[in-house]
C-alpha cells in the first residue's frame, strides 16, 4: 500500500490499477474486515526531531519543527471547504470512528489545521465526505453512546452540556469501573470531543455530510445530508452562490494551512 503515500496526481498507471483493485476489494468486504485490515497496516513514521531540556524551550523547538513539516502556504480563504474524513484518529485505535469522532475530526482537527486564519470564510460551508454510520464500540466508547443518543437530541449547546451533564457522566460508577478496569475512555471524554469542535461550529455556517448512509446521524449532529459529493456541492452553491470559491483539503497527509 506504499503507493497511497503519494499524491494521486503523481500516480503511475500501475498505481492507479492497484488503487482501483484495492477499492473494488474493499467494497466487497464487511466493514469490520475493512477496518481490521487497514488498522493492521503499520504507518511509515520516522523521527523528524529530538530535543531535550526545559519544557518551554523544547516546546518552542518542536512547534517550529512541526510547522516546518506541516505548514502549506495558502493565499485566500474559500467559501466552500471539502474534506474527506479518514478512518483514523487518536481515539479509535483498533476501534470504530463513531459519529462523535467523525465530528471531532471534521470540526476539531481538520477545521483547526490552520495558522493565522481558517481556510474557510466565516459563515462558509464545510462539506465532509463520510458514511456517518451509526456504530459505536461498547468496550472503548460506552459513554459516547449515551451522550449521542440521549444528550444531543436535547441540546447541542456546549455550555449547557457542560453545566448540566458533564459531572454526571464523570461520576457515573459504571463508566468509572470500565475506565479503571476495562479499556473504556473516561465517562466525560465525549464532552471534550464535543468541546473540541466548538470553534468550528461557531465559525461554519453549514455542514453537509456527503455520502452519509443515513439521515439521523447528520441530523443529530446538526448537519445536512447529501447522497454524494456532486449533490453536496450543488447544495453549498445554493447557499454561497455560483461563484463561490471551493477548496479541497486533502487529509491525510497532514497539512496545516498557513494562511496569508
Predicted regions and their residues:
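Structural motif
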Residues: 79-84, 127, 247-248
Amino acid at each position: 500500500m506504499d503507493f497511497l503515500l503519494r499524491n494521486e496526481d503523481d500516480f503511475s498507471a500501475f498505481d492507479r490499477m492497484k488503487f482501483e483493485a484495492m477499492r473494488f476489494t474493499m467494497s466487497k468486504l464487511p466493514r469490520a474486515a475493512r477496518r481490521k485490515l487497514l488498522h493492521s497496516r503499520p504507518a511509515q513514521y520516522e523521527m523528524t526531531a529530538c530535543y531535550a531540556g526545559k519544557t518551554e524551550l523544547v516546546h518552542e523547538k518542536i512547534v517550529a519543527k512541526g510547522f516546518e513539516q506541516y505548514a502549506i502556504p495558502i493565499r485566500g480563504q474559500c467559501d466552500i471547504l471539502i474534506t474527506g474524513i479518514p478512518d483514523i484518529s487518536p481515539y479509535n485505535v483498533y476501534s470504530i470512528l463513531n459519529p462523535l469522532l467523525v465530528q471531532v475530526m471534521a470540526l476539531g482537527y481538520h477545521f483547526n489545521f490552520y495558522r493565522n486564519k481558517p481556510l474557510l470564510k466565516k459563515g462558509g460551508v464545510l462539506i465532509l465526505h463520510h458514511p456517518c454510520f451509526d456504530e459505536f464500540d461498547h468496550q472503548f466508547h460506552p459513554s459516547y453512546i449515551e451522550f449521542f443518543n440521549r444528550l444531543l437530541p436535547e441540546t447541542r449547546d456546549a455550555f449547557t452540556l457542560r453545566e448540566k451533564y458533564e459531572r454526571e457522566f464523570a461520576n457515573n460508577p459504571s463508566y468509572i469501573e470500565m475506565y479503571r478496569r476495562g479499556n473504556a475512555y473516561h465517562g466525560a471524554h465525549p464532552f471534550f470531543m464535543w468541546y473540541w469542535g466548538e470553534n468550528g461550529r461557531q465559525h461554519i455556517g453549514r455542514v453537509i455530510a456527503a455520502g452519509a448512509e443515513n439521515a439521523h446521524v447528520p441530523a443529530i449532529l446538526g448537519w445536512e445530508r447529501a447522497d454524494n459529493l456532486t449533490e453536496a456541492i450543488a447544495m453549498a452553491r445554493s447557499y454561497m452562490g455560483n461563484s463561490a470559491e471551493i477548496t479541497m483539503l486533502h487529509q491525510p497527509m497532514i497539512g496545516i494551512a498557513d494562511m496569508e
